[in-house]
Amino acid sequence: MKVLDACGILHSDLDFSNEEYYITNEVLAEIVNETAKTMVDHGIYTGQLKIRDPTVENIAKVKEAAKKTGDLTRLSGADIGVLALSLECGAEIVSDDYAIQNVAASMRLKYHTTAKEGIQKEYVWEKTCPGCGLKHSIEFTKCEVCGTRLRNVGKKIVKE
């Protein structure tokens, strides 16, 4: 069983015939490429690709995990839905998105990529001011002390 995100569909040659695939309504709305849309529509029509949205509880769990890794601001609603549905179903995620992969790794969810190499290390991100060196929560964009634009810095490597 696999949960697909938009880039997992756009950069793959899935035919939906050999496994059970799921997509959320938000991911479905992101598919605007005509070729990919035709492939997705065919998968839905044949019943090999199912549309399912995650529960609010699993969305909350993913948001909490993404806050801990510092990836929350990098994830779209569709990305969060993909992670939450994977958590809910125990399904493998198909995505080339590094933020999805990082959060999935932190939650011990399985994932694989389609077009590019996946993450090599799992990071926890934080915002640091290059001006005064003060560390900030990931939600901030400017330093509260000196007003300098903050930089994302990998705080620690969780696994190698």
What does each model-identified segment do?
Residues E92-S95:
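Short glycine-rich phosphate-binding loop at a beta-alpha junction
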